[in-house]
């Protein structure tokens, strides 16, 4: 299975007609914006190469805007704004990891796209399995627990911890469609409520990240794979989610938390990994709105 993020150029006219029928003008323009951002941004913009930064632990929040941490982050460090190399998780992983030999690094990820990365990139990969009946819900506590296990098993490796929050579904809402907050905001125009809910969802992962910083030794960098549009306008129409070629999506935070102690890091050849089934990954990606 390989991720499919868009359609061929020759398919666009037919898809546009289909979108107009099913989603109206607003929904169609939203899809056009995402198509452009997902398929062209990463080809024309470099963005940061986070693997070349000096860190022992890299914490990635999924869909965390730069202004989210600037206004509400509780990390005791300066927050920079940097440009992500992509506006979508899979493009981000391709740009940051694919073709690399990061054999001094272990990846712990709740994002299902990590399941598609080649076996020879990292020393080890821990794909976090949803621990909830709703396959789109990934509890950040579970990610932290897996990360601590990974650190115990591989103490001399750099560690990447990829939380799914503040990406939808918002954990405070049970048994609701992942995009329900966006749908409601489109209908009511209440963007302040949406942002407040977004912050609340972020807190779940931030609390875990703060615990990780206390628990593990080494220099920690906190960032995001991409940001999130929360009603900002493109062509006069409010956009929601990610994929869009907009500052709210491609600008991400970068926070460096220093440490007095650093672990000794050295590379070793990759070890066998357990892959999740294609059916489960497809179900997760669809539930998260990626497909």
Give names to the regions the model predicted.
Residues 1-291:
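Catalytic domains that recognize anionic headgroups
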């Amino acid at each position: 299975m390989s991720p499919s993020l868009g359609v061929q150029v020759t398919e666009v006219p037919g898809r546009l007609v289909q979108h107009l029928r099913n989603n109206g003008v607003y929904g169609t323009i939203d899809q056009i914006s995402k198509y452009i951002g997902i398929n062209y941004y990463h080809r024309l913009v470099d963005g940061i190469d986070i693997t070349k930064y000096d860190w022992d632990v890299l914490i990635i929040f999924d869909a965390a805007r730069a202004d989210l941490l600037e206004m509400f982050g509780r990390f005791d460090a300066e927050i920079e704004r940097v440009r992500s190399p992509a506006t979508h998780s899979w493009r981000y992983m391709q740009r940051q990891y694919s073709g690399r030999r990061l054999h001094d690094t272990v990846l712990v990820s709740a994002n299902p796209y990590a399941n598609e990365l080649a076996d020879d990139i990292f020393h080890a990969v821990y794909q976090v399995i949803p621990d909830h009946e709703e396959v789109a819900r990934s509890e950040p506590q579970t990610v932290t627990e897996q990360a601590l296990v990974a650190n115990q098993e591989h103490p001399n490796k750099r560690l990447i911890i990829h939380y799914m929050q503040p990406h939808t579904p918002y954990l405070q809402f049970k048994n609701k469609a992942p995009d329900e907050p966006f749908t409601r905001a489109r209908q009511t125009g209440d963007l302040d409520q949406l942002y407040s809910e977004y912050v609340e969802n972020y807190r779940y992962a931030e609390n875990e990240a703060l615990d990780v910083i206390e628990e593990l030794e080494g220099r920690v960098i906190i960032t995001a794979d991409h940001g999130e549009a929360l009603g900002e306008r493109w062509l006069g129409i409010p956009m929601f989610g990610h994929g869009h070629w907009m500052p709210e999506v491609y600008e991400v935070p970068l926070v460096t938390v220093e440490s007095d102690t650093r672990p000794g890091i050295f590379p070793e050849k990759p070890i066998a990994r357990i892959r999740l089934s294609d059916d489960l990954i497809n179900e997760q990606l669809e539930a998260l709105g990626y497909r």
